[in-house]
């Protein structure tokens, strides 16, 4: 897959290596087979009782969270945060409120990409999981050296956490809106009044069709409450994957940064993680300052004989771009033979891309020339994410 191939050369951020060392101290020399059993047990718990509370008071559940789910979720958050960095989403944000923080995986992923954040508030209803987060964050020397302050609270959305400095505060919801009644609670949270509103909101959800499509429906709720969608959407029109498809949903794909014990742990599991997917929304009260028009790649490359076709988003319609590398003149045919786009890639719009329209009403396809493919490739380089170390 293009996304994974393009990003496999990325090294893990230094903060992740520090987290890995801290987790090793907590986990000790656990038996990989027992760890795998704990992961499967927790996974089955969520499948059989999706609305039940997480059993963090159980040692086996905490072990599964720290050894398996935490590394995956901090990688997802890091990928999403880098999409935001690409657009300047975090500029002026100094305080991060992490609702349903768990062990702080979402916060760590964002801090790895955005070291400018000065303060973190971890909020969760579980004292057990916050105790684990406290232990983990206490062992992250780089946060202390950078002067980043953090605290843990057992407050919830219903208790009305109010940002001390709303104009420089971000509310993070990572894998919490899947819980029962969470969407209704989130809508009430948004309607508290401007004086209590967070400047920025980041939502990460599972990349299933149901969760992804439900998250996209929250776009309109955010827009109605005076937020601007920064990513992944490139426009404020209706979502084409909701309006013109019965099954498509918007999600991104990122590489996982995995700890040293992962290979032995994953050997005992049926699920493998060569790449990670996540659905997300980034919104701010402030409108994006970049007035340029962007196109977002929303599908993996489809190789259809000698044609490459990919789903893109630039407005309210479901659209594809396509090209035939074998039909290009030399040397373009050779240079572009293996070129395709990664899910989530962003490139600058140009009216010339849309002059050769093909396809059906619910899936317009636009055929690109070799010069237009070169132009898109150059745009990718111009807008490339430069991950923080």
Predicted regions and their residues:
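S-adenosyl-L-methionine
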Residues: 134-164
């Amino acid at each position: 897959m293009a996304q994974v191939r393009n990003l496999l050369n990325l090294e893990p951020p230094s903060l992740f290596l520090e987290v890995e060392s801290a987790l090793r101290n907590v986990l000790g020399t656990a038996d990989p087979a027992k760890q795998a059993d704990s992961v499967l047990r927790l996974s089955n718990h969520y499948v059989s009782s999706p609305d039940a509370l997480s059993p963090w008071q159980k040692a086996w559940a905490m072990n599964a969270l720290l050894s398996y789910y935490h590394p995956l979720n901090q990688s997802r958050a890091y990928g999403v945060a880098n999409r935001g960095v690409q657009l300047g989403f975090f500029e002026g944000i100094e305080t991060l409120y992490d609702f349903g923080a768990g062990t702080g995986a979402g916060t760590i992923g964002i801090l790895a990409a955005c070291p400018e954040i000065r303060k973190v508030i971890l909020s969760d209803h579980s004292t057990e999981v916050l105790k684990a987060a406290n232990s983990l964050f206490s062992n992250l020397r780089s946060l202390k050296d950078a002067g980043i302050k953090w605290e843990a609270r057992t407050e919830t959305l219903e208790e009305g956490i109010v940002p001390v400095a709303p104009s420089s505060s971000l509310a993070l919801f990572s894998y919490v809106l899947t819980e029962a009644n969470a969407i209704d609670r989130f809508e009430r949270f948004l309607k508290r009044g401007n004086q209590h509103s967070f400047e920025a909101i980041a939502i990460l959800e599972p990349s299933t069709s149901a969760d992804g499509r439900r998250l996209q429906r929250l776009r309109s709720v955010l827009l109605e409450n005076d937020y601007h969608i920064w990513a992944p959407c490139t426009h404020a029109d209706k979502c084409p994957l909701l309006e013109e498809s019965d099954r498509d949903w918007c999600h991104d794909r990122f590489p996982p940064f995995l700890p040293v014990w992962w290979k032995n742990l994953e050997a005992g599991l049926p699920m493998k993680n060569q790449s990670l997917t996540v659905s997300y929304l980034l919104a701010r009260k402030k409108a994006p300052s970049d007035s340029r028009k962007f196109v977002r790649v929303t599908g993996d490359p489809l190789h259809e004989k000698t044609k490459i076709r990919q789903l893109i988003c630039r407005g309210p319609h479901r659209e594809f771009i396509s090209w035939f590398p074998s039909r290009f003149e030399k040397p373009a045919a050779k240079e572009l033979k293996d070129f395709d786009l990664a899910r989530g890639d962003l490139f600058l719009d140009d009216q010339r891309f849309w002059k050769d329209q093909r396809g059906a009403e619910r899936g317009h396809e636009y055929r690109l020339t070799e010069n237009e493919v070169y132009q898109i490739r150059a745009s990718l380089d111009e807008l490339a994410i430069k991950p923080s170390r």
